[in-house]
Amino acid sequence: MRVSEVCGLRWEDLDFEKREISVNHSLVYARWDGDGGKETFHVTTPKTEKGTRIIPMMDEVYEALKAEYAHQEETGFCTTKIDGMTGFIFRNRFGGVLHQGPINRAIKRVYTSYNDAELLKAAKAKRKPLLIPHFSCHHMRHTFCTRLCERETNIKAIQEIMGHADIQTTLDIYAEATDEVKHEAIKALQKGKDIF
């Protein structure tokens, strides 16, 4: 999911019985005409027409969302109202909604902290440090899609899960098969079929 789609998720967008997420809007923090030139939150339609979709939850996502729901039953649900919508799942430390800026800053704090410690350890051990490169929410979306492409052969299913308007986007940008995956694909073909 795009970070704006994740930030815009509301409890009513989840179907815990079917383990599905309804992606039908995005929460965007930007400058808008009529808002006096300041940045504000607005609910918008997804980035593309294909962006409106139903996606299945992975087991880890299901468990994390159930745990968050239980936590919010004790601590209170988000009551922020934006463009008539409320009940947003992901909150900042003050109980308001999140946007990509603070999320990307939190990610940066994690890898910067690790890299700082790794630089010291590597210097003490007189070895080359193993550093985590810069990454953001979008990089995680890209990585998710790449891993999905490595494990799934139905490109149409991948397009629908990712919400790409054009299947060419799925093929061009995300289908980055590694040499190892290409070798595994040929081995699987040979094992599963008598092709000669």
Regions of interest found by a model, annotated:
Residues 1-33:
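Short, charged phosphate-coordinating catalytic segments
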Residues 8, 16, 172, 176, ...:
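Phosphate-coordinating loops and pocket residues in cytosolic domains that bind phosphorylated ligands
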Residues 18, 25-52, 59-61, 93, ...:
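C-terminal secondary-structure termini that scaffold catalytic or DNA-interacting sites
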Residues 3-11, 97-100, 139, 144, ...:
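Gram-positive cell-envelope targeting signals
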Residues 27, 143, 162-187:
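Catalytic-site neighborhood detector that most strongly recognizes the C-terminal catalytic loop/helix
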